[in-house]
Design a protein with these regions (language model features):
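Extended catalytic cores of very large enzyme megasubunits
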Residues: 1-288
């Protein structure tokens, strides 16, 4: 196969199977054969399906996601799912660090993760019983970010994370501006959960309350916050915007689940503990 040097390097670094005992994929076709055989194992006629899968891969008609190519048929204890949204983070220290541990183990096995940090009380809010003030969701995002920097996800790639925060959270301005510091939260993609009520307030040039736990912490102009988000996106490409009410309205399972986050790249909204198995269909070779 005639392929570009960069393609060869990516295959060799990220998807080629090699183990300390010396077993390895000799070439790309060996990778396709390994993946096809592994995916065909559950079928009633594995040999027939392995051939069909291998033909699709060899012709680049369909490519499964990277975790499938890297992990299928290797015998390693890794996930074949690329992306997850983790469970809700409780607003207490035990739940926060239980979620950090869960995220670390998920990324160690190859999964990218999404988290909604809107459940954490804002910076300066009192913490009853300990005589202290909360440090806010961004301080704990720094903990996730440091953890992610130390995790080599499934052997050959760094972890990937998405952080979301509601547009009415009292720390939303700090969230929007967080990446003005080029060294901060580099392992995160970040998105604001924008509601229909907020967009209406922007259109009406109305006031917008920043609230948590039923208490209004501050009030600002909705249009000022919207323009702040747009300036940040223009200047350093983040945060993104997720129209979360529309996402939930169009979810076929809206009657039994609530979506508040997406996978790391943002293309797949998921409920808590939801997972997505990704793949690419190459229409260029399927359509004449």
């Amino acid at each position: 196969m005639d392929w570009a040097p960069v393609s060869q390097r990516i295959w060799d670094m990220k998807y080629r199977f090699c183990d300390p005992a010396g077993a390895k994929d000799e070439d790309l076709q060996a990778t396709w054969k390994r993946v096809a055989r592994a995916l065909a194992e559950p079928e009633k006629d594995p040999e027939a399906w392995a051939g069909r899968f291998e033909e699709a891969l060899t012709g680049f008609k369909f490519l499964p996601a990277g975790r499938v190519i890297a992990g299928a048929g290797t015998g390693r204890t890794v996930t074949l799912f690329n992306c997850f949204v983790m469970g809700a983070i409780g607003d207490d220290m035990a739940s926060i660090f239980d979620n950090v541990k869960e995220a670390a183990l998920t990324m160690q096995q190859g999964g990218g993760i999404g988290h909604d940090f809107s459940t954490l009380r804002p910076n300066g809010a009192p913490v009853r019983g300990v005589g202290a003030d909360a440090s806010g969701p961004l301080s704990f995002m720094d903990v996730w970010d440091s953890m992610c920097r130390t995790i080599m996800s499934a052997g050959s790639r760094r972890g990937a994370m998405m952080a979301t925060l509601r547009c009415d959270h009292p720390d939303i301005e700090a969230f929007v501006d967080a990446k003005r510091d080029p060294k901060r939260l580099r392992m995160f993609n970040m998105s604001v959960l924008v509601t229909d009520a907020f967009m209406q307030a922007v259109k009406d040039d109305a006031d917008w309350n920043l609230v948590f736990g039923g208490k209004t912490f501050r009030t600002l102009k909705a249009r000022d916050l919207w323009e702040r988000i747009m300036r940040a996106t223009y200047e350093y490409a983040e945060p993104g915007v997720i129209f979360i009410d529309r996402v939930n309205r169009r979810n076929n399972l809206q009657y039994c689940e609530q979506i508040q986050a997406t996978n790391p790249c943002g293309e797949q909204p998921l409920p808590p503990y939801g997972a997505c198995l990704l793949g690419s269909i190459n229409l260029a070779v399927l359509v004449k």
